[in-house]
Amino acid sequence: MKEPIVLFDEPEISLHTNYLDELAEAITDVNARLNILISTHSSRLTKNLIIECDTILLYNVKLVNRYSLVYRMKRFPQYSPTSKYRVADDHINAYFSRVNLFVEGETELELFSNPYLRILFPKLKKIDVFKAVSEKPVLNIMNPQLSNSQIPYLCLIDIDKAISFDKTRKRFALKPEYLPEDDKERFRYRNKHESSQYLYSQRKRIEAMQRKLHVHYYLPYLSCDDTNYYAFVSALQKYLLSYNVFCLRTTIEGALVNYRTLAFALDFLKRNTKAQNFEKFNVYWKSLHKTDKLNLLRMLFNGKSDLLRSRKEAFKLVDSEIRDTLDTVTIGGKTSGWVSKYLDDFFKETADEIKDTFTEKKFRKYLESEDKRKHVLRLFEENFFELYSLIERLCGMINE
C-alpha cells in the first residue's frame, strides 16, 4: 500500500492517562506516509495531539436530526499561539460539549452547580460551564467561534467588562474586549417584512447614547435610578447577545440580590450574622434612600453598585464607625459558599410544604406535581428575572 491508513476507535478505553500520553507520542512519530484516523472522546489525547503535531486535522462530528454533520476545526495554536502553554485537559472538554457557558469566576461556577437549580432546570445538566471569561488565552482555546467547532455557546459577563464610568466627568466609555471593532461590525440586511434593527444601527445608537449620557447618582455608593442609564444598558445587552455575550446589569451577585429579592436577601443576612451586629447595621440601613439600600445590600454580598463601585471603594468613603459596622455584616466572599446556601434557602421557602429536612430527593419528588413545578418556576422567574432569562436562553440552545 502506497498510503496505508490505520483506524483507531476510541483507543483511550482502559488506558491510564500516562499511557495515553505515550500513545500520542507514538502517533506523532510514525512515518509521514502513514495516515492515522482516530475516533475519540478523550480530551487528554486530543490535547496532546494538537500540541505535538502540526499536521493534525481535527474534525467535530455531530448528530443533528438523525444526520451526522462533520465540521473541520481549527487548532488553537493556529489562531492563538500563546494559548499552547495554558492548555489543560478541562479546556479540551469544551470540544465535546452540547452547549458551552463561559463565565468569569468561582461564584458563577458555584451557582450553576447548585443541585436544586439543576433539579428545577434539568437541561442545565447538558450544559458545560467553564471559568474562562477573565483569561483570554484560555477562552481562545475553547471559543467555538475561533475553533469552528459549531458548538452553541454563551459568554456571561458583568457589565464592567463592557463599560466603565468616569465619576469626575460623569461619562461612560465602551470597552473593546467584547465589542467588535467598527470595521468588523456585522451588517444585517433585511427586507420590507423584517422589523428588527441592523446591528450596525444598534451600535451607532449605543455610541450616541454613550457620548450624550449624563446620569444622576447618589453618594457614597454610586447608586443610580436614572431611566436613561437603564435604557443605555438595555440597548447594550440586546446588542451583545447578537455576539453570544450575555451581559448582566451589574454582576452575578446583582442577579441574586435585586429589588425583587431585597426582603429575602435582608432576612438571609440577618440569619447569617450576629444579632447585635445586624441590629446596628439595620439602624443605618433604614436611614438610607431606597436605591442606596439595594446597592449597599448588594455590596455586602460582594457585588457592585449600579455604577460599578466596589465594596472596598465605597466603604472608604463612609464614617469609620459605620464602616466597622458594615464590615461585621459583610457576607459575600468568592469562596464563602453563600451562593449555595442562598439558593438552598430560597427553594426551601418556595417549597414550604416539604416537612422536616429539606433534601434534593424531597424537592425532586415535590416537583413531580406539574402545578407545584409551575409555581416554583413562576416564583423563580419573578425573583431572579435576569438569571431566569439566562437559563431559558441556554436551554433553548440545546439540540435534542
Q: What feature does the model see in each segment?
A:
Residues L45-T55:
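Short regulatory helix/loop adjacent to the ATP-binding pocket of P-loop NTPases
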Residues E3-I5, A32-L37:
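Loop/turn-to-beta-strand initiation segments
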Residues K62-E400:
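Acidic, divalent-metal-binding catalytic cores of TOPRIM
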Residues E12-I13:
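Short loop immediately C-terminal to the Walker-B catalytic DE motif
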Residues D21-N31:
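Helical segment within the ABC ATPase nucleotide-binding domain
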Residues T40-R44, L63:
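Conserved H-loop
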Residues M1-F8, T17-N18, E22:
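GG-anchored amphipathic helix commonly corresponding to the ABC/SMC/Rad50 NBD signature/C-loop
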